[in-house]
């Protein structure tokens, strides 16, 4: 029963503790949590710890300051790229002994001429490979709410967050994966003087892939809110604001060969290319070193900055007629050099008429309990972060045959890059009859 050998009953448990207290002038709350989850597949589990602290200060009647700090740490254990316990349990014949090794194709024979098959056992493959992901997250925020006047409020919101993750996956020298790609024979099955040993790129050690990512972001927002009723029939609401936000993502990915985790996590050097000789006597080329210098190492560094100004306006007369308007302008480091798009705001307008509140309806059409007409028109946009206002040149290594550094153009420039524009019209009617039947038309 492959499911019995490769899977289990999933089980998870969570624990949380929290404290809180305070007065009208000061309050606090703190919490901690722990979660452990064992997945359905043996070898797949997750552990997570979280924490949160929140403080509220009210030094004067009209001023409120709130601060929050969040954090979490998690670790996830999983499988190597080509290890799928559930798929193997579903598709594999039950006659096969789970502890036995059976023959698989030798993918390395084209370099050695040796077509002998390789030994394969799924449980051995699972136990001698794996993956692990670690993540650390922390965020802090500050909110200030100040009622300057009865009809005027100032709000400040600021936040900063960081998320660091480390991912690694590995396959040791005891796996079929390494034998099939880099060795051509089962581990420890040949002598150092044999032709197969001399033709192996990686006679000792396995492969380790690591990927480290660091993300940072901050957000600052200032808003002024205006809300005033001039008399029972007239009310005005308005808001002015600015927002500054930025996000940066940095990452480094790397692959090394010769990884031996059971000997102090050492790296054993692969065979020198000039010493890797096929049975025919000709070198096989750079071998693993070619992979090392050909896209196996990668670093990314990407930053997006945005500065925004926005305003909203809403006017209500007799609580029946409402008009509103919104305008927003954004600047970004991903835009081009076209001066016509440096100030290119988005905007929207809307209206609403509560017809059922009119005297005519109240007197002659009482069975129409609700009748609203509304409409909006607006332009919205998204930043095309995948495009670039500048020429992107990929500076590569040395071009074979020319023995010169070479570069390739990966993206042509778009100097007219700006927000994409989407126009929206919306009209709607809300109707209710006898306080029983309701209809909405958009």
Tell where the protein language model's regions lie, with residue ranges:
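Residues on the lipid-exposed face of transmembrane beta-strands in outer-membrane beta-barrel proteins
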Residues: 17-21, 53-57, 140-146, 220-228, ...
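A short alpha/beta connector and helix-capping loop motif
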Residues: 343-351, 435-440
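Surface-exposed loop/interface segments of Gram-negative outer-membrane beta-barrel transport/assembly proteins
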Residues: 1, 39-44, 50-139, 155-157, ...
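One face of beta-strands
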Residues: 32, 158, 347-351
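Residues embedded in well-ordered regular secondary structure
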Residues: 1-43, 80-82, 125-128, 145-147, ...
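Long hydrophobic segments that form regular secondary structure
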Residues: 145-150, 420-442
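Transmembrane beta-strand segments that form the barrel wall of outer-membrane beta-barrel proteins
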Residues: 32-38, 323-335, 375-377
């Amino acid at each position: 029963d492959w499911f019995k050998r490769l899977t289990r009953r999933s089980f998870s448990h969570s624990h949380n503790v929290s404290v809180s207290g305070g007065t009208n002038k000061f309050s606090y709350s703190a919490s901690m949590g722990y979660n452990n989850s064992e997945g359905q597949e043996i070898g797949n589990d997750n552990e997570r710890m979280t924490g949160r602290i929140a403080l509220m200060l009210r030094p004067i009647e009209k001023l409120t300051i709130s601060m929050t700090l969040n954090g979490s740490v998690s670790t996830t254990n999983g499988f190597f790229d080509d290890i799928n316990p559930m798929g193997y349990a579903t598709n594999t014949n039950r006659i096969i002994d789970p502890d036995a090794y059976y023959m698989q194709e030798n993918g390395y024979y084209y370099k050695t001429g040796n077509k002998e098959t390789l030994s394969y056992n799924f449980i051995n493959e699972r136990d001698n490979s794996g993956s692990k992901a670690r993540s650390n997250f922390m965020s802090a925020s500050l909110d200030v709410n100040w009622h300057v006047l009865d009809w005027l409020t100032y709000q400040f919101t600021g936040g900063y967050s960081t998320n660091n993750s480390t991912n690694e996956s590995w396959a040791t020298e005891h796996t079929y994966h390494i034998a099939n790609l880099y060795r051509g024979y089962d581990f420890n099955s040949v002598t150092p003087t044999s032709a197969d040993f001399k033709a192996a790129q990686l006679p000792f050690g396995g492969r380790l892939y690591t990927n480290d990512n660091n993300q940072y972001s901050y957000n600052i927002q200032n808003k002024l809110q205006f809300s005033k009723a001039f008399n029972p029939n007239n009310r005005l609401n308005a808001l002015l604001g600015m927002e500054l936000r930025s996000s940066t993502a940095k990452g480094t990915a790397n692959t090394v060969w010769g990884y031996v985790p059971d000997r102090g996590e050492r790296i054993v050097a692969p065979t020198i290319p000039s010493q890797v000789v096929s049975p025919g006597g000709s070198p096989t080329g750079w071998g693993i070193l070619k992979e090392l210098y050909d896209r196996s190492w990668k670093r990314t560094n990407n930053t997006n900055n945005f500065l925004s100004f926005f305003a909203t306006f809403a006017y209500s007369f007799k609580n029946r007629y409402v008009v509103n308007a919104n305008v927003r302008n954004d600047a970004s480091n991903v835009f081009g050099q076209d001066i016509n798009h440096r100030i290119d705001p988005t905007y929207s307008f809307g209206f609403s008429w509560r017809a059922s509140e009119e005297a005519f309806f109240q007197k002659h059409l009482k069975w129409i309990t609700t009748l609203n007409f509304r409409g909006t028109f607006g332009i919205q946009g998204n930043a095309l972060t995948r495009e670039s206002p500048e020429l992107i040149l990929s500076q590569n290594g040395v071009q074979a045959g020319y023995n010169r550094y070479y570069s390739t153009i990966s993206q042509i420039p778009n100097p007219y890059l700006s927000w994409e524009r989407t126009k929206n019209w919306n009209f709607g009617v809300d109707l209710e009859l006898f306080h029983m039947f309701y209809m909405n038309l958009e």
